[in-house]
């Protein structure tokens, strides 16, 4: 018959109220935890000069050495320490295909025989030439006070031109559809920037380098904001996403054909394309813009801030200096828009919500660049572009 448990009475070390038996001695939790920490101290460390210190007095413990000595004298035993009782430390790593094969998820299905060492080059020089021609044209003459208002009017005009056109639903995303939407997106961004007076004053090479780097981030925000705007006006179903000029697609009901750009299947490359997290983020961004319902002026500033900061961080040097100057000038004009036109004395909360959207897209751009690097290392894609910097975030 086991010995009875005596769980009441004072702690045998310090005299405080006990909490049970610890390491063979009736003690409080404090003394038990102390002994667990100090049982491995060296003999030299546990020697006290006085040797007769009072363990607990005036609400505090006075001498660690005498306290440890008392623990040993009353019978605390370090051999009674219990280990491997922590569920976290004792559980094994959940088995998965990644653990079993010893390969990270993003290269789980990487098959060397499907790698594409020799690639087909897609020449997009004609797009660069078209962009140069657009930048050489005279901008729209609008009697507006600043460039942010000019860009806002340009955006409204670009979207207004499509009001009477029927929106086409893309059910299959293959080579033709991808190249077409990329071409439309790039030229759309160039057209918008061509009406940005301060941007037109930059050196020709700087302008083209910025456009080639930032157009993807620009068009992504443009399409998300256009989708949100159409939902607010009840002209687009909630399951649809704008992807091109007058074209959209169901976010959960479309076919993807990758045979033109890789030897791998869509299932094998799920990591590189629209993952469930990506879709969730896009839906949330659209809903945030529906709730905020930003004006064309606010959208124009967001487009500038997102695209120019992305280009500046990627290219550095003179381009970073130029983009920072452009963004700062437009920030001042946005302040005037809030303070003078809308008569808002406190707009920081709204601006924070708008910038949260651009920060989310910035993070998405960085992730896409890292994925592209992984794809290049393993030769996942069998195509390349004559101007690769234009497509590192597609």
From Swiss-Prot:
ZnF (NR C4-type) intervals: 11-31, 47-66
Keywords associated with the record: DNA-binding, Metal-binding, Nucleus, Receptor, Transcription, Transcription regulation, Zinc, Zinc-finger
Similarity field: Belongs to the nuclear hormone receptor family.
CDD domains to which the protein is assigned, alphabetical: NR_DBD_HNF4A (cd06960)
Main location, first listed in the record: nucleus
Signal sequence annotation: none
GO cellular component: nucleus
Function: Orphan nuclear receptor.
Any Pfam family: Hormone_recep
Protein's UniProt name: Nuclear hormone receptor family member nhr-103
Residues within the DNA-binding region(s): 8-83
GO molecular function, one term: zinc ion binding
Localization terms from the record: Nucleus
SMART domains associated with the record: HOLI, ZnF_C4
SUPFAM superfamilies: Glucocorticoid receptor-like (DNA-binding domain), Nuclear receptor ligand-binding domain
Keyword Methyltransferase among UniProt keywords: no
Organism annotation: Caenorhabditis elegans
NR LBD domain sequence ranges: 126-394
């Amino acid at each position: 018959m086991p010995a009875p448990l005596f769980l009441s009475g004072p702690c045998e070390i310090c005299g405080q109220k006990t909490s049970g038996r610890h390491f063979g001695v009736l003690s409080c939790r404090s003394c038990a935890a102390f002994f667990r920490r100090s049982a491995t101290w060296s003999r030299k460390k546990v020697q006290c000069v006085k040797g007769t210190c009072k363990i607990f007095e005036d609400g505090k413990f006075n001498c660690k050495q005498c306290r440890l000595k008392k623990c040993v004298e009353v019978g605390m035993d370090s051999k009674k320490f219990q280990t491997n009782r922590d569920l976290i430390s004792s559980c094994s790593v959940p088995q998965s295909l990644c653990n079993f094969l010893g390969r990270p998820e993003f290269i789980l299905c990487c098959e060397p025989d499907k790698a594409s060492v020799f690639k087909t080059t897609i020449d997009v020089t004609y797009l660069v030439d078209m962009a140069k021609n657009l930048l050489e044209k005279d901008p729209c003459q609008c009697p507006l006070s600043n460039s942010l208002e000019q860009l806002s009017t340009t955006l409204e005009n670009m979207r207004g031109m499509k009001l009477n056109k029927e929106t086409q639903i893309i059910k299959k995303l293959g080579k033709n559809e991808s190249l077409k939407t990329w071409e439309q997106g790039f030229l759309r961004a160039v057209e918008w920037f061509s009406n940005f007076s301060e941007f037109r004053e930059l050196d020709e090479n700087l302008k083209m380098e910025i456009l080639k780097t930032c157009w993807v981030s620009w068009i992504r925000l443009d399409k998300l904001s256009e989708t949100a705007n159409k939902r607010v006006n009840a002209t687009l179903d909630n399951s649809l996403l704008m992807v091109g000029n007058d074209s959209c697609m169901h976010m959960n009901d479309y076919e993807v054909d990758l045979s033109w750009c890789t030897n791998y299947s869509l299932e094998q490359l799920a990591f590189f394309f629209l993952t469930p997290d990506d879709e969730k983020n896009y839906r949330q961004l659209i809903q945030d813009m529906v709730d905020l319902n930003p004006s064309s002026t606010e959208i124009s500033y967001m487009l500038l801030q997102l695209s120019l900061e992305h280009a500046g961080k990627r290219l550095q040097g003179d381009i970073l200096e130029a983009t920072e100057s452009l963004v700062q000038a437009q920030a001042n004009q946005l302040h005037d828009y809030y303070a003078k036109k809308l008569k808002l004395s406190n707009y920081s909360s709204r601006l924070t919500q708008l910038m949260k959207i651009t920060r989310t897209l910035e993070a998405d751009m960085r992730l896409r660049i890292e994925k592209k690097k992984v794809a290049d290392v393993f030769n996942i894609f069998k195509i390349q572009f004559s101007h690769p910097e234009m497509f590192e975030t597609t």
